[in-house]
Structures are given as C-alpha cells and as structure tokens.
Amino acid sequence: MKFIVSSTYLLKQLQVLGGVINNSNTLPILDNFLFDLDNNKLTVSASDLETTMSSVLDVDSDNEGTIAVPARLLLETLKTFPEQPLTFVVEDNNTVEISSNHGKYALAYADGAEFPKAVELANPSSTTLLGDILATAIDKTIFAAGNDDLRPVMSGVFFQFSTENLTFVATDAHKLVKYQRTDVTASQVAEFIMPKKPLTLLKGILAGSESDVVIEYNDSNAKFSFENTELICRLIDGKYPNYEAVIPKENPNVLSIARNQFLSSVKRVAIFSNKTTHQIRLKIAGAELNISAEDIDYSNKAEERLTCSYQGDDMQIGFNSRFLTEMLNNLNSDDVSLEMSLPNRAGILTPIDGLDEGEHVTMLVMPVMLNS
C-alpha cells in the first residue's frame, strides 16, 4: 500500500478529524486514524464510539489497503513540515514509512480491521440546510445546554424540524435559548436531541461555510454530510422537556436598552455580588434602570444607573449575573429587549435588531429571589 499526498492538505483534514479522538480511550484502537485507501481516494476516519467522522482525500496512488495509524504521533509530525509531497509506504514489518524531501520516518500501525465500523442509518429522514446556518444555530444555543449527568436530555441541543421551520433549543433549567429559522424547512416533522461534542465539532468546521449540509436521522443516530466529510453520532435517548410551557406568554413589562451598555454595566456591578449566588438586582422606574449588587459578607456593594426605554409597572427583579452575561454576550444586536411579568417569573431576552430574514432568537432567564 503506497500513496503520495500534500503535507499541509493532509494536516488540515486530520486536525479536523482529530477533534473526535478522546485524550484517554478504553479501546487503544481509538487512538488511531483509520486510513482506507481505494486507488486515488483515501478515506480517513476517527471515532470515540459515540461519534465517528470521516473525510475523503485526493491522493496519488493506484493501490488499495486499510491501516490504523497513531493519531497523535502523525499529527505532531505533520505540524513540523512545510508544504511538500509526502510518500506513505506500508512495509512488511508492520510499520508505515513516510518519506519527505529531507528524511524518512517510520511508525508502527495497527490492523485496520480492528477499527470499529461506522453505523449505517436504517430508513433515515433527511433535511438540507446551509452550513453557516447550522453553525449559527449551534453557536446560539449550545452554551445554554446543561452539564448534569443525571439529566442527560438537558445536556444536548434539541432539534425540532417541521414543514414550517427548524427550531433549536437548549436549556439547563436556569436559562433557555430557542433559535428558530423560518427560511429553512423540513419535509416532515422530526425531533431529536444532539450531544454537545459532535455539535462543537460541526460548529468549528461549518462557521462561515457556504456549502450545503445534508442531515439524515432516525431514532438512534444522526448523520451530517458536507463537501468531502461526514459525521455520524449517537443521539441522546429520552424525551425533551416541554420548553414551550415555561416561556411566559403575558409579559406586560418591557425594557429596551443598548446591549453593550447593559452588558458592561452588569459585568462591572457583578464583581461586587455574592460569590455563590452572583445575584444582581434590576430596579426599573420610568426611563431609569438601576442595577445593583451587594456582598454582605464583605461589605462590598455597587450600583449603576442607566437610561432605558420602558413600558410597564415599576418593578424589581433579581438575576444571576453569570447567566445574564452569557446571554447578552451571545447576542450580536445593538439593542435588546427584556420582557417581564412578575419578579418570580422568567424574563425573556430578545434582540431588537441584527437578525437575518427568517431568524428568531428567544432567550429565557430564571430570576433569583431577592433578599429585601
């Protein structure tokens, strides 16, 4: 088995696939890339059993063969090469020899047959959307997903497809984000929960991408195919909570304010808040928003006044500043609106501008009880 490939082209593809490989694997074979050569097409795969990702590369060869190559060793070697052709030759003594312009490097390989086979999706449904739209949907939601192993359904992002729109939801019970696109639809209704790891990989690869992504899915797995790459992952098993039920419908009190001004004020005041609750207080009266925090244990306190536009009754409401900061950071609008009903009901944060046609973002943040 022998092939010739550009060093930088191979490195670029392997760095993408390397994100799948865990630092410590129970199965040693998973520390490898699977190289499957079929004449001038080399398919490289990486897996952690839950997620498998593979790319098809163009190489110069007229051989066939399958080997598993140590991922970390190969990546470290490739990073040091300037652009040049590399020749890979599989020797009889169980090593693969790489020849560059200046030297030869031999590394031991494992039998490719030991590498776990990727799942074939049985009777999948499919939906196609632009890579950048998927990357944005992941970016806007994934930060709100939980980390609680006891509630695995909340540790992923809920994909909800219909013939009218595509909706992506994430929540950890303290905050919730719903991102909706009405400019993209599916041929039939479907819903599934995607784990964080494959989504993080997809987000990194697809940001700014103009190519289409085909999403195929059934009850247990999902497959994302784009350009020369495909990613297959196991879905999170379980039923997603009824998130619509927690979004308050009647919110008579509406605050509108410049996002950056609100964000920097919350960040500053939060420095003086209690280190366990991170509680800040919003007090709104007329066109004035008063943001304050106090850490009674250390006699630290801070207060800022901002002008805002507000319709509704004067009110005071407490929030965890970390959640509020995360959400404001994740929006890119100039102005935001915060809709509230009562101090013990969730606040709804939405961007006022800066959205594409057909793009809708709703963020929900649970209040914290104010100690008077």
Q: What is each stretch, according to the model?
A:
Residues 1-372:
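Structural preference for solvent-exposed beta-strand-turn elements
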